[in-house]
């Protein structure tokens, strides 16, 4: 409440916060500031402060597991769609946990750490926070190797991305060039950029088909928030879910893209 980006200090006379959204990051993923709405805690006491205009209803949606779906898309070339099938019809984290020999909770943490380019130390600590740095590095290296072995086609995908990134760039889902700082970040950049491209296409398709009373409130990474009159709520929710699927189809993804839309009076009720 006292910092430069304190919400009340950034609140306008219209009782709104107009945050800044940039798409100029290295991975073309959206970045948020003044304030960073992506860092608003998920707790109800914080999210309920963000409300719909009186007489309007908030409608919002998140892309469902977009990072894992992008991984499934790129793996399909090497695993024949196995990862995508388990992701959609089974429990991918439990399958990997059984293969690696760690808990489902730990393998889920390891999965996202791996996808976001974490080093061996961080991966080791994600399994056991009590480890020393050296032991965490050794444990992380072991878990990383087991994780790669557990997922059919992942080793081949990593090698292909590493080879392509040797030139300094890789291509995103829409063909744009992504400049890669180092080869070990290449897969992370590929998945993050392609997920961002899907999110923006989702936003575009939704915007082109909005119900008469609807207008946008926020775009935060893989989340869209709108408000509309009560009579347009169901149409808007349907549109958000349909547009997500169409965004994936637009780029001929090897796995369907999905979103779950909710409505309510505050951000706490729709996210």
Language model segments and positions:
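Short, well-ordered loop/turn and helix-capping segments at boundaries between secondary-structure elements
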Residues: 72-80, 116-120, 129, 149, ...
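Generic alpha-helical secondary structure
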Residues: 120, 136, 140, 154, ...
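Catalytic palm active-site di-aspartate
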Residues: 60-63, 111, 120-123, 215-229, ...
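Catalytic palm subdomain of template-directed nucleic-acid polymerases
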Residues: 121-131, 224-240
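Acidic, glycine-rich two-metal-ion catalytic cores of nucleic acid-processing enzymes
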Residues: 1-101, 160-223, 237-246
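Short alpha-helical scaffolding segments that buttress acidic/His motifs in well-ordered protein cores
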Residues: 71, 107-115, 147, 191, ...
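Polymerase palm active-site segment centered on the conserved acidic dipeptide of motif C
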Residues: 147-159, 231-271
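Short, basic interhelical loop/turn and adjoining N-cap
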Residues: 127-142
């Amino acid at each position: 409440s006292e910092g430069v980006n304190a919400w009340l200090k950034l609140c306008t006379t219209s009782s709104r916060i107009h945050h800044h959204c940039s798409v100029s990051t290295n991975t073309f993923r959206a970045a948020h500031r003044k304030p960073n709405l992506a860092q608003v805690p998920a707790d109800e006491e914080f999210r309920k402060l963000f409300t719909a205009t009186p007489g309007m209803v908030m409608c919002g949606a998140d892309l469902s597991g977009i990072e894992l779906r992008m991984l499934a898309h790129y793996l399909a070339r090497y695993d024949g769609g196995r990862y995508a099938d388990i992701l959609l019809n089974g429990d991918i984290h439990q399958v990997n946990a059984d293969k690696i020999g760690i808990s489902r909770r730990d393998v889920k943490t390891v999965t996202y750490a791996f996808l976001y380019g974490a080093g061996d130390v961080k991966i080791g600590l994600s399994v056991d926070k009590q480890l020393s740095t050296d032991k965490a590095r050794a444990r992380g290296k072991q878990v990383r190797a087991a994780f790669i072995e557990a997922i059919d086609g992942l080793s081949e995908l990593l090698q292909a991305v590493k080879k392509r990134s040797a030139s300094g760039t890789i291509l995103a889902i829409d063909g744009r060039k992504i400049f890669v700082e180092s080869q070990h970040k290449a897969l992370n950049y590929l998945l993050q950029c392609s997920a961002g491209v899907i999110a923006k296409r989702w936003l575009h398709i939704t915007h082109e088909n909005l119900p008469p009373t609807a207008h946008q409130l926020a775009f935060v990474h893989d989340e869209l928030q709108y408000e509309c009159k009560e009579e347009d709520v169901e149409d808007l929710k349907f549109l958000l879910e349909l547009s997500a699927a169409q965004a994936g189809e637009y780029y001929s993804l090897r796995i369907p893209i999905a979103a779950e839309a909710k409505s309510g009076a505050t951000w706490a009720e729709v996210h």
